[in-house]
C-alpha cells in the first residue's frame, strides 16, 4: 500500500512539474503555444456548449467498438496459432503481412469499400487492435515453460486440462500487454480516421480547429485523448494486477 501511494504521489508530482513547465514556456514566450489557463478556459467553453461531451462519446464509441472486437478475435486466434502448428503455419504469415501495413494506410480503401459511415472507422480500429493483441497472445503461448507442460503430462493431465490450467494462466501477462498496446493503437487510429472522414469526434474537432488556427481547441482535444487513454490504461493495469496475483513484481 505504501509503495502504491508513493507511486501515485510521484505520478501527481510528475504531472505538476509538466504543467508548470508548460506554463513557464508559454508565459515567457519561449514557445508560441496556448498556456494551461487558455486551454482550460476553452475546455470549459466546449463543455458548456456540449461539443466536448459529444466528441468524447463519438470517439469513445468508435474506440471501444473496434477495440473490443479486435481483442475478442485476437485472443482465440493467438491461442490457436500458439497451440497448433498447422494453424500457426496457415495464419502467422498473414498476420505478419498485415502488421507491416500501417492501419492508417487502409483508411482510404476502407472508405471506398465500406462507405463513409462508422464502418470504415471501426474497421481500421479493429485491425490495429487485433494485430497488436494477436501477436502478444501467440507469443505468450509459445513462451510457456515446457517444463510445466511436461510435468502436467507426467501427472496424467490431458491436453484440454493443460491448456486451461497451464497455458492460459501463463499467457495472461502477455495477453494484457498486447491489450494495452492495442488500446494505444486504437486511440491513434481513431484520431487519424476522424481527421479524414468524420462529422464528430476529437480528431474531427482538431481538424476543424486547424483550419482556423484555433490552437486552444486542438490542445483541448489532445489533452482529452491523453486523459481518456491514461484512464483506460490504468483500468487495464488494475485488471492485470488482479488476474496475475501469482506473479512476482518488482
UniProtKB/Swiss-Prot annotation:
Q: How does it sit in the membrane?
A: Multi-pass membrane protein
Keyword Cell membrane recorded: yes
For the biological process aspect of GO, one term held by this record is: transmembrane transport
For this UniProt record, the keywords arranged alphabetically read as follows: Cell inner membrane, Cell membrane, Membrane, Transmembrane, Transmembrane helix, Transport
- Localization in the cell: Cell inner membrane
Q: Which residues cross the membrane?
A: 12-32, 63-83, 94-114, 122-142, 172-192, 211-231
Domain ABC transmembrane type-1 span(s) in chain numbering:
56-236
Q: Which InterPro entries match?
A: MetI-like, MetI-like_sf
Q: Name one GO cellular component term.
A: plasma membrane
* Chief localization: membrane
**Is Coiled coil among this UniProt entry's keywords?**
no
A Pfam match is BPD_transp_1
UniProt subunit comment: The complex is composed of two ATP-binding proteins (BAB2_1147), two transmembrane proteins (BAB2_1148) and a solute-binding protein (BAB2_1146).
Q: What does this protein do?
A: Probably part of an ABC transporter complex. Probably responsible for the translocation of the substrate across the membrane.
Say which family it is in: Belongs to the binding-protein-dependent transport system permease family.
What is this protein's record name? Probable ABC transporter permease protein BAB2_1148
Amino acid at each position: 500500500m505504501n509503495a502504491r501511494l508513493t507511486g501515485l504521489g510521484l505520478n501527481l508530482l510528475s504531472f505538476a512539474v509538466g504543467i508548470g513547465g508548460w506554463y513557464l514556456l508559454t508565459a515567457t514566450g519561449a514557445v508560441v503555444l496556448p498556456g494551461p489557463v487558455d486551454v482550460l478556459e476553452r475546455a470549459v467553453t466546449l463543455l458548456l456548449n456540449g461539443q466536448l461531451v459529444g466528441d468524447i462519446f463519438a470517439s469513445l464509441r468508435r474506440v471501444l467498438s473496434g477495440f473490443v472486437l479486435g481483442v475478442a478475435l485476437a485472443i482465440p486466434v493467438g491461442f490457436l496459432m500458439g497451440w497448433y502448428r498447422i494453424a500457426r503455419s496457415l495464419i502467422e504469415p498473414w498476420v505478419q503481412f498485415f502488421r507491416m501495413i500501417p492501419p492508417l494506410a487502409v483508411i482510404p480503401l476502407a472508405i471506398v469499400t465500406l462507405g463513409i459511415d462508422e464502418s470504415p472507422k471501426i474497421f481500421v480500429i479493429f485491425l490495429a487492435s487485433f494485430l497488436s493483441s494477436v501477436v502478444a497472445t501467440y507469443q505468450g503461448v509459445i513462451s510457456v515453460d515446457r517444463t510445466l507442460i511436461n510435468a502436467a503430462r507426467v501427472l496424467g493431465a490431458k491436453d484440454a486440462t493443460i491448456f486451461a490450467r497451464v497455458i492460459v494462466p501463463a499467457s495472461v501477462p502477455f495477453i494484457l500487454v498486447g491489450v494495452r498496446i492495442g488500446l494505444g493503437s486504437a486511440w491513434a487510429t481513431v484520431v487519424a480516421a476522424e481527421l479524414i472522414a468524420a462529422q464528430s469526434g476529437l480528431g474531427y474537432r482538431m481538424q476543424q480547429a486547424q483550419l482556423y488556427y484555433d490552437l486552444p481547441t486542438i490542445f483541448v482535444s489532445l489533452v482529452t485523448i491523453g486523459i481518456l487513454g491514461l484512464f483506460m490504461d490504468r483500468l487495464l493495469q488494475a485488471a492485470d494486477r488482479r488476474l496475475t496475483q501469482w506473479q512476482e513484481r518488482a
